Design a protein with these regions (language model features):
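Alpha-helical subdomain
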Residues: 1-140
Length: 140
């Protein structure tokens, strides 16, 4: 695992720093968790595409964003956006478009709680007004 300090929007510089510790000519897994809700849809698609272009065939891309379909979720997104950073409540189809032409791994784009069917949610985790949507895709 390699951690670099940089601006994710500067893909070329970030990838150069990563390449100092990771062989990007071999398959890797790129995690972009809780990141893309800070980007407008077109900017998110562009950002993901720039990173995916650097991945070797057989690599995996994992994306997740927070979102919600309730008044409470809308209030939360609004409150956050009124502060230091604008956040976007991406729809599921919009989020799915961030994967571009990549092949999604089953079960596809789903609520994170549905990623492992049959898994019992611990009793101490209450239902939420919002959700986390996730997806995993494999590069060709």
């Amino acid at each position: 695992m390699t951690v670099v300090d940089g601006d994710v929007r500067e893909a070329a510089a970030t990838l150069d720093a990563v390449a100092a510790g990771v062989d990007l000519s071999a398959p890797v897994c790129l995690l972009m968790g809780y990141l893309l809700h800070f980007f407008a849809p077109d900017a998110a698609r562009d950002l993901v595409a720039r990173y995916v272009a650097a991945l070797a065939p057989g690599s995996y891309l994992v994306l997740s964003v927070g979102r919600g379909d309730s008044d409470a979720a809308d209030k939360g997104f609004g409150s956050y956006s009124a502060g230091a950073a604008r956040v976007y409540n991406h729809s599921v189809p919009e989020f799915a478009s961030f994967f571009g032409p990549l092949e999604l791994v089953p079960p596809g784009v789903v609520d994170a709680r549905e990623w492992r069917p049959g898994w019992e949610q611990p009793l101490h985790l209450p239902p939420r007004d919002g959700q986390v949507i996730v997806g995993v895709a494999r590069t060709g």
